[in-house]
Amino acid sequence: MNFETIIGLEVHVELKTNSKIFSPAPAHFGEDPNANTNIVDWSFPGVLPVMNKGVIDYGIKAALALNMDIHQRMHFDRKNYFYPDNPKAYQISQFDEPIGYNGWIEIELEDGSTKKIRIERAHLEEDAGKNTHGADGYSYVDLNRQGVPLIEIVSEADMRSPEEAYAYLTALKEIIQYTGISDVKMEEGSMRVDANISIRPYGQEAFGVKTELKNLNSFNFVRRGLAYEEKRQAEVLRSGGQIQQETRRYDEATGETLLMRVKEGSADYRYFPEPDLPIFEIEDEWIEKVRAELPAFPKERRAKYVNDLGLSAYDAAQLTSSKAISDFFESALAQGADAKAVSNWLQGDVAQYLNTENQTIDQIGLTPENLTEMLQLVADGTISSKIAKKVFVHLAKNGGSAKEYVKSAGLIQISDPAQLLPIIQEVFANNEKALNDYKGGNKNAAKSLVGQIMKATRGQANPQVAQKLLNEELAKLTD
């Protein structure tokens, strides 16, 4: 019996606000335990939540970016559960009236085709704290994360393979990153994924019993966990067993999914309206103000790069995979840089440098202005492409003007025949064997002579001019 896989994803995205959703405590990552807390986060008796308006702004922005309708009458609910990282014994979330609903995004599949994935809802809520279990036998609670604003984005069960789930997450991350509402760094917990998966015989309309997967710490782990789980469920059904509704965790070491607990239903959380927060009315003017702040998204930019700039689809995809890179590219174009030249540098030397130094493009000294200046120096023959690599490293480390660095470091390319001809004659005098080989008919010997010219000028000779002059001088010797 063959089965069809049904997948839906729940993605938690931490919103990049300065303060928390209901308290003035900072919402920054990486501080000492419990440094970013106050009496609201600790749930001291009598304290009340105060809504952070910026969180609603970001919620509206996310909903618009995901083609969602917006609940203009918005309220919060209590989700009741007891756990040490949740001092109130309930989480303030949204249940029946999320800020966004009925949305969709388009994903690109491996064969180049596209598919629309529907999004059921996007709701705002507060994050929980973090428990750490020490080697000393004690458990520790860090409430820095308690109250950090989240938006949970719940897809419909429209994905039919782990590969489609991977493509959905990639597209969703790009869109959220472009809005600027989150840095979507899975390694810091600002983007977390839970996956729901079931299988059913082909032709059956009813969904099978689903399992939820957790501990999916990268998109690749999502893909691998889903692939294992669809295989496990198929083996259970083929052997006559039944799938249980449960929560399982992905084991990165073994590639398997392991039982965590029997899955709770929403009734287990005893949702009811949050009495300490008012109902919020989101006016049309508010929505339109946020809409005006939306950037051009990756799909639009890719189309522009291919259709207007003549770049390949591959180059366009690489340039738009990061908003910072795409913004840098567009700023360089605004400075007058050649699109293909900037694209080549961003995907080549710049990408390699960022990877080696573990930095982002906004953390280094290279700017659209000094990169454009450097490319112009190459285009007008002031420096060679080889020297440009040295100039780039200097700019990345130190910033500043490419033109001033080239001048102060003595890197200006030698293009004057009056300077190059004596050097060529000196190379002839010091390389008699290569010269005689050339005279004897070995034309490849000229390559070593070019190399010697570049060595003698420490790479500053204009390769085209040097080659032309060399050919002319060699022709005189063989006439």
From Swiss-Prot:
Transmembrane segments: none annotated. PROSITE patterns: GATB. InterPro entries: Asn/Gln-tRNA_amidoTrfase_suB/E, Asn/Gln-tRNA_Trfase_suB/E_cat, Asn/Gln_amidotransferase, Asn/Gln_tRNA_amidoTrase-B-like, GatB, GatB_C_1, GatB_Yqey_C_2, Gln-tRNA_amidoTrfase_suB_CS. It catalyses: L-glutamyl-tRNA(Gln) + L-glutamine + ATP + H2O = L-glutaminyl-tRNA(Gln) + L-glutamate + ADP + phosphate + H(+); L-aspartyl-tRNA(Asn) + L-glutamine + ATP + H2O = L-asparaginyl-tRNA(Asn) + L-glutamate + ADP + phosphate + 2 H(+). Its EC number is 6.3.5.-. GO terms for molecular function: asparaginyl-tRNA synthase (glutamine-hydrolyzing) activity; ATP binding; glutaminyl-tRNA synthase (glutamine-hydrolyzing) activity. Gene3D superfamilies: 1.10.10.410, GatB domain, N-terminal subdomain. It comes from the Bacteria. It is an enzyme of class 6 (ligase). Pfam families: GatB_N, GatB_Yqey. Keywords: ATP-binding, Ligase, Nucleotide-binding, Protein biosynthesis. One of its GO terms (biological process) is translation. PANTHER family: GLUTAMYL-TRNA GLN AMIDOTRANSFERASE SUBUNIT B MITOCHONDRIAL AND PROKARYOTIC PET112-RELATED, GLUTAMYL-TRNA(GLN) AMIDOTRANSFERASE SUBUNIT B, MITOCHONDRIAL. Heterotrimer of A, B and C subunits. Belongs to the GatB/GatE family. GatB subfamily. Allows the formation of correctly charged Asn-tRNA(Asn) or Gln-tRNA(Gln) through the transamidation of misacylated Asp-tRNA(Asn) or Glu-tRNA(Gln) in organisms which lack either or both of asparaginyl-tRNA or glutaminyl-tRNA synthetases. The reaction takes place in the presence of glutamine and ATP through an activated phospho-Asp-tRNA(Asn) or phospho-Glu-tRNA(Gln). This is Aspartyl/glutamyl-tRNA(Asn/Gln) amidotransferase subunit B. It comes from Streptococcus mutans serotype c (strain ATCC 700610 / UA159). The lineage of its organism: Bacteria, Bacillati, Bacillota, Bacilli, Lactobacillales. The gene is gatB.
